């Protein structure tokens, strides 16, 4: 088979199963409204949960820092790209989440890959929730360690896997809030089991940080859990982009030596780091608390209004509200029907989710109003699917 034939066959297979992904060009993609092709839609696909991507204080911080530092960092943090803005943000994050250290990464994907790749060796084992993010599972598959997956949120299965003999070290991997199902992991029980088997715990709290817990400290804080490795990302609750790993002093020093994504990547722009510090200040403030409370009320309003006889609504109380429709083509038709009525929603299909669980992944944000939720419910129930 030629290279071209391989490419063509893969694309043909995706088209045949209604799983071909595509991008949409938008004029505005974050916030209450999405604008595409000159039309305005209520936006139910954004990760900007607290509406901070449009916050004037954060925008101003980025602009002022860009004037001071320029638009790029100029190098890896190990060469010339670790500015006072980066250092300040790392200190603020560590103090906020009560960890000895925080290390910045250019993305959550990079952070997860870097940590797992740097830590795991040939005789080690990774035990990951089977619905863990692609960045975690890909890193685990690429590492020399053995990967075992436990049934989603099934702590008994996790315990059985950890009990089997392992010559090296074991790492338990889970998310705080799951990106496709919107539910939360039983973190306290998972941590208890991990410690009983002398395993370390890595929690990716991309969808919880900033949005849940006291001062937005996330799912782990809310559950009274402190994993050895906490990954937080900044493209959701923070409204910007990037990520950080919270850990001990020695692990931070280790990652600075062996995390290749950190050593060999140009660091995020200093202006971005300063904008993230401004975002953190909003998240920790009374305004941040009010934004979280409003979002929680909108989620409750949506869940109370969904017709459960027509849609499978998962046990998700986060900003992520998936409606399971099962069939790929039905999910695509439903998403298109919503767009025709002015509501932008995304159909999620395999391989992102398991076969037979195609869904509308609806995300609610603080930027929405109660009338927006009511309109979404009206359109959903009249979609004819």
Curated annotation (Swiss-Prot):
InterPro entries, alphabetized: Aminotrans_II_pyridoxalP_BS, Aminotransferase_I/II_large, AON_synthase_class-II, AONS_Archaea/Proteobacteria, AONS_Proteobacteria, PyrdxlP-dep_Trfase, PyrdxlP-dep_Trfase_major, PyrdxlP-dep_Trfase_small
Catalytic activity as recorded in UniProt: 6-carboxyhexanoyl-[ACP] + L-alanine + H(+) = (8S)-8-amino-7-oxononanoate + holo-[ACP] + CO2
Modified residues annotated as N6-(pyridoxal phosphate)lysine in this record: 236
Names of required cofactors: pyridoxal 5'-phosphate
Family statement drawn from the similarity comment of this UniProt entry: Belongs to the class-II pyridoxal-phosphate-dependent aminotransferase family. BioF subfamily.
Subunit structure: Homodimer.
Stated role: Catalyzes the decarboxylative condensation of pimeloyl-[acyl-carrier protein] and L-alanine to produce 8-amino-7-oxononanoate (AON), [acyl-carrier protein], and carbon dioxide.
Name by which UniProt lists this protein: 8-amino-7-oxononanoate synthase
Organism the protein comes from: Salmonella newport (strain SL254)
Gene behind this protein: bioF
């Amino acid at each position: 088979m030629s290279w071209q034939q391989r490419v063509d066959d893969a694309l043909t297979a995706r088209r045949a199963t209604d799983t071909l992904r595509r991008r949409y060009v938008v004029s505005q993609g974050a916030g209450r409204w999405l604008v595409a092709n000159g039309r305005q839609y209520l936006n139910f696909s954004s990760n900007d949960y607290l509406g901070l991507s449009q916050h004037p204080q954060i925008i101003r911080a980025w602009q002022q820092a860009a004037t001071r530092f320029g638009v790029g960092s100029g190098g890896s943090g190990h060469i010339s790209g670790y500015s006072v803005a980066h250092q300040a943000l790392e200190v603020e994050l560590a103090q906020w989440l009560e960890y000895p250290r925080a290390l910045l990464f250019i993305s959550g994907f990079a952070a997860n890959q870097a940590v797992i790749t740097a830590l795991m060796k040939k005789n080690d084992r990774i035990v990951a929730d089977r619905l863990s993010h692609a960045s975690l599972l890909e890193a685990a598959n690429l590492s020399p360690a053995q990967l075992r997956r436990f049934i989603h949120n099934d702590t008994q299965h996790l315990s059985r896997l950890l009990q089997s003999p392992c010559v090296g070290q074991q790492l338990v991997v889970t998310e705080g809030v799951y990106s496709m199902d919107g539910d939360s992991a039983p973190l306290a029980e998972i941590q208890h089991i991990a410690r009983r088997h002398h395993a370390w715990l890595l929690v990716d709290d991309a969808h919880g940080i900033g949005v849940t817990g006291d001062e937005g400290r996330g799912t782990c804080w809310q559950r009274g859990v402190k994993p050895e490795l906490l990954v937080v990302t900044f493209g959701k609750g923070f409204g910007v982009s990037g990520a950080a790993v919270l850990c001990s002093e020695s692990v931070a020093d280790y990652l600075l030596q062996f995390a290749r994504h950190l050593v060999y990547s140009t660091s995020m722009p200093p202006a971005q780091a300063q904008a993230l510090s401004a975002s953190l200040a909003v998240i920790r403030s009374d305004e941040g608390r009010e934004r979280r409370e409003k979002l929680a009320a909108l989620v409750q309003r949506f869940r109370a209004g969904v017709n459960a006889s027509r849609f499978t609504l998962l046990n998700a109380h986060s900003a992520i509200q998936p409606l399971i429709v099962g069939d790929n083509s039905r999910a695509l038709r439903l998403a298109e029907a919503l767009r025709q009525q002015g509501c932008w929603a995304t159909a999620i299909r395999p391989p992102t989710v398991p076969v037979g669980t195609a869904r509308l992944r609806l995300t609610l944000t603080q930027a929405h109003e109660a009338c927006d939720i009511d309109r979404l419910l009206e359109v959903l129930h009249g979609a004819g699917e």
